[in-house]
Structures are given as structure tokens and as C-alpha cells.
């Protein structure tokens, strides 16, 4: 009996050690750039803010990574962190998807909101989390966006929302679609209050998010190479039966056609935001 007990502990310890070694190997593996196929050391990519050093392809950031990149150290104060979705329409498998998304992303929902400062400039911030069901907009995402806007109005401070989304969350049906009108309405009040709203579009920003709050800002910024649009290019091509222009729906194309105001490299993001906030508040 004693022998068996020791054997189990030894096996458990060995198993944990092997798992740890496997995790370390995964972390150390080089990453292939999806744009230029360059092999990049994971540490080098992290040091370069997850931007390919050869072709400048911008890899996705988690919401927490983007917050750390943009705001002053220890200035972020999250609010509404306890809000999370539930299966209000009894959609098959939705509850399991929510639980899995929370586990994988470490976030309770598809957006994180809070108060922060950028070089001392106070603002309300919302950052979408692509790791949570592709940051699709359901009832809770819409509610958190609205509460962030209302908080900015109450404090009379600027609002910054960083978008990346696959669109409305299909598992919530019309409730998800209603969030487009809901967020647009509260932003209309924000605009009437004369306050500054900056929108940062990252890869990808599509569907109901691109057709609502992401496109209603006073200043619209975008990261290079981001896919931005309502329907995807393949759907549009099949619908109209024509070849699409090169780089169609990419941020560079939208800049050329007056749909966004400025392309911002990730390394310049905080400085650019600081300048815009300084001009507005100064």
C-alpha cells in the first residue's frame, strides 16, 4: 500500500514535469509569419510588439496585451468585469462555447472596459478580445460598450475603443443585432455632448461591429493590413460576380478611399494617441 502511494506521487510528479517541458518547447518554437513566411523566434516577435521584423505584418494581440501597450503603467482600472453572457435563447451548445472561450482567453467576455491614462491624459477605454469567440458582439458586449460611453459622458473625458470582431454573435440572434442600434444611439448622445471618440480598427473588424460603433468615431485609426468591412471579400466577389481591387477591404485601401483617417504602426500607437488626446485637451 505504501509502495503504491509513493508510485503514484512519483508518476504524478514526472507527468507534471513532462507537461512543463512540453510547454517550454512550444513557447520556444519559431513562429511562421502568415504574410512573408519568415520564421521568427517567439521572444524576438514578443520584443517587437508582435510585428514581423521583415514584412511588418501585425500579429493579433490579446486585449490585455494591447492595454499594456497603450496605457500608462498601473493606470488601468477595469469596470463591469463581472458581466458575462448566458444562453438566453437556449441555442444548442452555446453555453459550452462560452465556458470554453472564458477558459481559453482568460476573459469573461469579448471586450474589456475601464478607466486609464495615456501619458497622463485620462480616458475611458474599451478593447475587444479576439480570443473570446472572435470578439463577436452579443448582449453583454453591447451593454459594456454602452456603459463605457455613458461613463465617459459622466466623467466628461475622451473615449477610445479598439475593435477586432467577427461581427454579431449568431447564437444570440436578434438580441445581438439589436446591439448595433443600441451602441449607435448612445454614441449619438456622446457626440451631442461634444466629447472626443477615437476608434482603432485592428485585424479583423467586420460585420455588425464595423457597421456600428467602430465606424462612428470622430477620429478613426487603423493598424496596417487590417481587414475592415461588413461582409467578407469572398462573399462580395460571389455576390457581384466580379474581381475585386487589390487589397480590397484592407486598411490601406480604406485610407486611400477616405474611410479612415490614419494608419498607425503598433510601435507608434501610444505616441499617436497621446498627441491626439493632448491636442483635444490642450
Curated annotation (Swiss-Prot):
Amino acids binding Zn(2+): 33, 36, 52, 55
Nucleotide-binding is among the record's keywords: yes
Domain CoA carboxyltransferase N-terminal: 29-282
Keywords of the record: ATP-binding, Cytoplasm, Fatty acid biosynthesis, Fatty acid metabolism, Lipid biosynthesis, Lipid metabolism, Metal-binding, Nucleotide-binding, Transferase, Zinc, Zinc-finger
Subcellular location per the Swiss-Prot or TrEMBL entry: Cytoplasm
GO BP term, example: malonyl-CoA biosynthetic process
GO MF annotation terms: acetyl-CoA carboxylase activity; ATP binding; carboxyl- or carbamoyltransferase activity; zinc ion binding
InterPro entries: AcCoA_carboxyl_beta, Acetyl_CoA_COase_Trfase_b_su, ClpP/crotonase-like_dom_sf, COA_CT_N, Znf-ACC
Listed EC numbers: 2.1.3.15
Function: Component of the acetyl coenzyme A carboxylase (ACC) complex. Biotin carboxylase (BC) catalyzes the carboxylation of biotin on its carrier protein (BCCP) and then the CO(2) group is transferred by the transcarboxylase to acetyl-CoA to form malonyl-CoA.
Subunit field text: Acetyl-CoA carboxylase is a heterohexamer composed of biotin carboxyl carrier protein (AccB), biotin carboxylase (AccC) and two subunits each of ACCase subunit alpha (AccA) and ACCase subunit beta (AccD).
Protein name stated in the entry: Acetyl-coenzyme A carboxylase carboxyl transferase subunit beta
Species the sequence originates in: Syntrophomonas wolfei subsp. wolfei (strain DSM 2245B / Goettingen)
Gene name of the record: accD
Amino acid at each position: 500500500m505504501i509502495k503504491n502511494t509513493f508510485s503514484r506521487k512519483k508518476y504524478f510528479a514526472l507527468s507534471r514535469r513532462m507537461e512543463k517541458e512540453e510547454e517550454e518547447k512550444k513557447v520556444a518554437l519559431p513562429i511562421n509569419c502568415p504574410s512573408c513566411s519568415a520564421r521568427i523566434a517567439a521572444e524576438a516577435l514578443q520584443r517587437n510588439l508582435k510585428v514581423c521584423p521583415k514584412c511588418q505584418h501585425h500579429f493579433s494581440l490579446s486585449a490585455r496585451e494591447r492595454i499594456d501597450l497603450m496605457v500608462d503603467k498601473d493606470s488601468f482600472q477595469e469596470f463591469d468585469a463581472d458581466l458575462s453572457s448566458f444562453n438566453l435563447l437556449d441555442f444548442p451548445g452555446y453555453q459550452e462555447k462560452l465556458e470554453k472561450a472564458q477558459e481559453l482567453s482568460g476573459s469573461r467576455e469579448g471586450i474589456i472596459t475601464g478607466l486609464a491614462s495615456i501619458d497622463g491624459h485620462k480616458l475611458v477605454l474599451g478593447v475587444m478580445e479576439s480570443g473570446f469567440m472572435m470578439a463577436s458582439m452579443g448582449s453583454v458586449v453591447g451593454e459594456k460598450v454602452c456603459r463605457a460611453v455613458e461613463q465617459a459622458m459622466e466623467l466628461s473625458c475622451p473615449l477610445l475603443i479598439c475593435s477586432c470582431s467577427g461581427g454579431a454573435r449568431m447564437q444570440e440572434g436578434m438580441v445581438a443585432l439589436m446591439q448595433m442600434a443600441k451602441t449607435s444611439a448612445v454614441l449619438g448622445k456622446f457626440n451631442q455632448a461634444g466629447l472626443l471618440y477615437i476608434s482603432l480598427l485592428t485585424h479583423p473588424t467586420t460585420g455588425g461591429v464595423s457597421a456600428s460603433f467602430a465606424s462612428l468615431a470622430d477620429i478613426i485609426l487603423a493598424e496596417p493590413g487590417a481587414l475592415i468591412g461588413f461582409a467578407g471579400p469572398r462573399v462580395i466577389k460571389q455576390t457581384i460576380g466580379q474581381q475585386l481591387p487589390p487589397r480590397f477591404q484592407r486598411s490601406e485601401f480604406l485610407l486611400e478611399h477616405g474611410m479612415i483617417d490614419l494608419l498607425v504602426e503598433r510601435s507608434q500607437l501610444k505616441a499617436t494617441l497621446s498627441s491626439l488626446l493632448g491636442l483635444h485637451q490642450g
